[in-house]
Design a protein with these regions (language model features):
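Charged, glycine-rich active-site and insertion segments that engage polyanionic ligands
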Residues: 1-52, 60, 67, 181-184, ...
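Clamp-loader machinery-focused feature within the broader ASCE/P-loop NTPase space
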Residues: 1-167
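Short secondary-structure boundary/capping segments
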Residues: 70-72, 177, 197
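Conserved catalytic/switch belt of AAA+ P-loop NTPases
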Residues: 144-147, 170-184
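Structural recognition of the conserved hydrophobic beta-strand(s) that form the central parallel beta-sheet
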Residues: 155-159, 172, 183-189
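Residues immediately C-terminal
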Residues: 163-164, 178, 194
C-alpha cells in the first residue's frame, strides 16, 4: 500500500490525517474545499495535496522528486492555478495571441507573478488586491486547457474561490457537474458563505483550525528568515494574528502603524480630542474600504482587550492596550466598552457596503464611540 505524508502544523494534523486516509484508501474526492481564517495555511496545504495527487512514487507520496511533484510546484505551469486578478490583468492577451517578439505582458505573465509570490510564502494575506476577482474568462481558460492534459493526473488549485463573480461561479459549477477523469480541484476560501451553495455541496469540506501562539511565533520567524530576531515577532503581532502566521507576518511589518493609530483613535475619542484625532485620520489616508476596515479590525481588537483589562483577563495585545491607559477613565465600564465594540462592528459593515466614504464613517465613529462616557 502506498503511504502518504502531508506536512504542516500540529494544530491541523487531524485534517491532514483525514486527507491522507482518503488518499491511502484510493477514495479521494475530485473536489475539496479548504476553508478557514486568512493566513493559516490553506494554500500551503493545497500545494501539499497537489503534490501527493500527482506523485508517482510507488512507496511514499509526495516524494518531491518525481515529474508529478515537480509539475505541482512549477511556477511556470499557470494552468495548475485559478487565482483572483485585476480586470486589466485578466483581460490581457493570452500568450497564444501575441506576436513573436512582443514585450506586452500576457495574462500568463501576470498569473505567473502571483503564483511565484504564493510559492515564496503561501501564508501571505496580501498577495491579491481587494478589487481582484476570478472572472468567467479565467474559468473558461482553465476548462479549455483540459483537452491538452493527456492522461496525466491534473490538479487545479482555485485560490480564494469566494472571489468568483456570478458568471464565473456558474461556469465553474458546470465544470464540477462533470469533472474530467484524473482531474482534481482544490478550492481555498476564508469566506465560504460567499460561495454558491451548489458549489460547496459538491466539494468535500475541510475546515482548518488556527495555530497555537507558539506555532504562530515559530512559523512567522521561519518566514522572516535565518537572520530574523525573535523580538521582531512581538506579543501584539501574535495576539492580532488570532492563530494566523500570515496575519502575524503582516503585523510584524505594519503592526506598529496600525496599533499606534488605533490607540490614538480610542484615546482621542475618550478625551473628545477630535482635532488631533481628525488630523491623524486624514494623514493615515484610509480612503479605501479594505484599508479602513483593516484599521477598524485593530480598533475592535483593542476594545476587546480593554474589556479583558477591566475583567483582569490575559491581554492579547498588551503593549497597545497599555497606550490607552484605560484606568484613567473610571466612567468607562465593561458595558460601555461592549457598546463601543458593537458600534465599531456596525461601522465596519457600513464601510464594506461602500455607500459612504470611509473617512466620513471614521469621523462619525470617533464621536459616537464613547458618547455619554466622558
Amino acid at each position: 500500500m502506498i503511504e502518504y505524508r502531508l506536512n504542516g502544523p500540529a494544530s491541523q494534523e487531524r485534517q491532514r490525517i483525514r486527507l491522507m486516509a482518503a488518499l491511502r484508501e484510493n477514495r479521494f474526492p475530485q473536489s475539496i474545499l479548504i476553508d478557514g481564517p486568512a493566513g493559516i495555511g490553506k494554500k500551503a496545504l493545497a500545494i501539499e495535496v497537489a503534490k501527493a495527487l500527482q506523485c508517482s512514487d510507488p512507496n511514499m507520496r509526495p516524494c518531491g522528486h518525481c515529474f508529478g511533484c515537480k509539475m505541482a510546484v512549477d511556477r511556470g505551469v499557470t494552468d495548475n492555478w485559478v487565482i483572483p486578478m485585476e480586470s486589466k490583468e485578466a483581460h490581457a492577451k493570452s500568450s497564444d495571441d501575441v506576436s513573436a517578439g512582443s514585450t506586452a505582458k500576457t495574462v500568463e505573465d501576470f498569473k505567473q507573478a502571483y503564483i511565484e509570490e504564493i510559492f515564496k510564502n503561501p501564508y501571505r494575506i496580501d498577495v491579491f488586491s481587494a478589487g481582484a476577482e476570478i472572472s468567467v474568462g479565467l474559468i473558461r481558460s482553465m476548462t479549455s486547457a483540459f483537452a491538452l492534459k493527456g492522461d496525466r493526473v491534473r490538479v487545479v488549485i482555485v485560490a480564494e474561490a469566494d472571489r468568483m463573480n456570478d458568471s464565473a461561479s456558474n461556469a465553474f459549477l458546470k465544470t464540477l457537474e462533470d469533472v474530467p477523469p484524473n482531474t482534481y480541484f482544490i478550492l481555498t476560501t476564508s469566506s465560504r458563505e460567499k460561495m454558491l451553495q451548489t458549489i460547496r455541496s459538491r466539494c468535500l469540506a475541510l475546515h482548518l483550525l488556527p495555530l497555537s501562539d507558539d506555532e504562530v511565533r515559530s512559523e512567522t520567524l521561519r518566514m522572516l528568515g535565518e537572520d530574523a530576531d525573535a523580538d521582531e515577532v512581538t506579543d501584539d503581532a501574535v495576539g492580532l494574528s488570532v492563530g494566523s502566521p500570515g496575519k502575524a507576518l503582516y503585523y510584524v511589518g505594519a503592526g506598529k502603524k496600525w496599533c499606534e493609530l488605533a490607540a490614538s483613535f480610542v484615546k482621542g475619542s475618550l478625551l473628545a480630542d477630535y482635532y488631533d484625532l481628525f488630523t491623524q485620520l486624514s494623514e493615515a489616508e484610509l480612503d479605501e474600504a479594505a484599508e479602513a476596515n483593516r484599521f477598524l479590525e485593530v480598533v475592535s481588537f483593542l476594545i476587546s482587550d480593554l474589556m479583558r483589562a477591566k475583567s483582569g483577563a490575559k491581554l492579547r495585545i498588551p503593549a497597545t492596550t497599555a497606550l490607552v491607559n484605560i484606568d484613567a477613565f473610571p466612567r468607562v465600564d465593561v458595558a460601555a466598552l461592549e457598546r463601543a465594540l458593537e458600534t465599531v462592528q456596525e461601522t465596519m459593515s457600513r464601510v464594506a457596503s461602500r455607500r459612504t466614504a470611509p473617512p466620513m464613517l471614521l469621523l462619525s465613529l470617533s464621536i459616537k464611540l464613547f458618547e455619554g462616557c466622558k
